[in-house]
Amino acid sequence: MDDKTSKAAAAEKAKALAAALSQIEKQFGKGSIMRYGDNEVEHDIQVVSTGSLGLDIALGVGGLPRGRVIEVYGPESSGKTTLTLQVIAEMQKLGGTCAFVDAEHALDVQYASKLGVNLTDLLISQPDTGEQALEITDALVRSGSVDLIVIDSVAALVPKAEIEGEMGDSLPGLQARLMSQALRKLTATIKRTNCMVIFINQIRMKIGVMFGNPETTTGGNALKFYSSVRLDIRRIGAIKKGDEVVGNETRVKVVKNKVAPPFKQAEFDIMYGSGISREGEIIDLGVQANVVDKSGAWYSYSGNRIGQGKDNVREYLKEHKEMAIEIENKVRENQGIVSRAATFPASEAEDGE
């Protein structure tokens, strides 16, 4: 009898939980709650590669989701702008229209071009005030013809009142209110037009924090709530050739993820002048997935040796792009995420061209 009662009680609890989960999803949207162990993923969303295979895997869906707000934050020179420029390059390859709202007035167009960004088709705005930047963003989203907008950065979205005021004026909470109002307006339109909006953010230190993390991001709390994906990007080391530093070792942590389980991380190399070393990642992840065989210093693929030492294999894959994409798609298949060639429906990619 006790066993039957406990089973009935467990069934009731499970039923009540299912009803609560259904109510939460109805109220707050799909993906607002999920069982971590189920590894449930929204498969009907369109994604765009980040330019990093490891990060695409860590995101759980093969890239950044369209029709969502994304936040990328980290310390100075950690690779925030590089990562977003790589996403722009990937979106342009798929025929998408991209805009860069340069509130910091610091975009290096030569560097963007080296990362594969098509500057001819890129829309660039350098607004004078935070209100102007967010109004431009709103107009672009509402047009329904822009696929990706990057705002660099939240810290540089200075309210008009602050610009027109005196240098020592205290205007607490002005930027936070501006961000909160803008995101309330933007969110529904972003979802409807399937436009991805990436906010780059900076880190500040809270004063007087004795315990816990003293770091916080600028612009108040609104962006934390409205973001579907939040990425914390850090420089963890230098890549050297002899005594010369030629790149950064970078770690990205998925701090928040509404489309797949969060808290995963990826490590990759950002090479100066060329961006994320995709070939280096393909080699490492290919070996992990047993797609590429490693014996001593030699690497082999499909029974054929492709080079001795990682640097030589990296150069080989740069010259043989078809093989690199083939290995990458096998790794993606192994991880159960969308292949790079099939990130968009073909008809949509053609329409955008």
Swiss-Prot record:
Q: Where does ATP bind?
A: 74-81
Task: Look up the signal peptide feature and give its range.
Answer: none
Biological processes annotated in GO: DNA recombination; DNA repair; SOS response
One Pfam annotation reads: RecA_C
Keywords, A to Z? Answer: ATP-binding, Cytoplasm, DNA damage, DNA recombination, DNA repair, DNA-binding, Nucleotide-binding, SOS response
- Family the UniProt entry places it in: Belongs to the RecA family.
Write the protein's name. Answer: Protein RecA
Q: Which organism is it from?
A: Bordetella pertussis (strain Tohama I / ATCC BAA-589 / NCTC 13251)
